[in-house]
From Swiss-Prot:
Pfam families: Ribosomal_L20
SUPFAM superfamilies to which the protein is assigned, alphabetical: Ribosomal protein L20
UniProt name for this protein: Large ribosomal subunit protein bL20
Entry's Gene Ontology BP terms: ribosomal large subunit assembly; translation
Keyword Ribosomal protein tagged: yes
Gene name of the encoded protein: rplT
GO cellular component, one term: ribosome
UniProt-listed InterPro entries: Ribosomal_bL20, RIBOSOMAL_L20_CS, Ribosomal_protein_bL20_C
PANTHER family registered for this protein in UniProt: 39S RIBOSOMAL PROTEIN L20
């Protein structure tokens, strides 16, 4: 039986990793061993940060809603509670958008929330 050398397969694997490491600084984009570690670590960061992105956006939305609610004389928690009691089901992403781009509509929502708290 003929001996199978793995030069073609190894070269393809190395090329694949070096292509993924394109744009990295120094040896990270040129030396296979270093590039492999950099690509693995980049994948770990990407996996982690796809989850963190969701948390961070929710935090941003809450901060924006809180700021707008306080301008209308109500705290965030009381505002959300008032909306729930008024059975207004608008998610935080849309509320934050309204708070930034449509102050009049947000003020109306805040008044509605205040009214249903009493």
């Amino acid at each position: 039986m003929a001996r199978v050398k793995r030069g073609v397969v190894a070269r393809a694997r190395h090329k694949k990793i070096l292509k993924q490491a394109k744009g990295y600084y120094g040896a990270r984009s040129r030396v296979y061993r270093v590039a492999f570690q950099a690509v693995i670590k980049a994948g770990q960061y990407a996996y982690r940060d796809r989850r963190q992105k969701k948390r961070q956006f929710r935090q941003l939305w809450i901060a924006r809603i809180n700021a707008a609610a306080r301008q209308n004389g109500i705290s965030y928690s009381r505002f959300i509670n008032g909306l729930k009691k008024a059975s207004i089901e608008i998610d935080r992403k849309i509320l934050a958008d309204i708070a930034v781009f449509d102050k009049v509509a947000f003020a109306a929502l805040a008044d509605k929330a205040k009214g249903d708290l009493v």
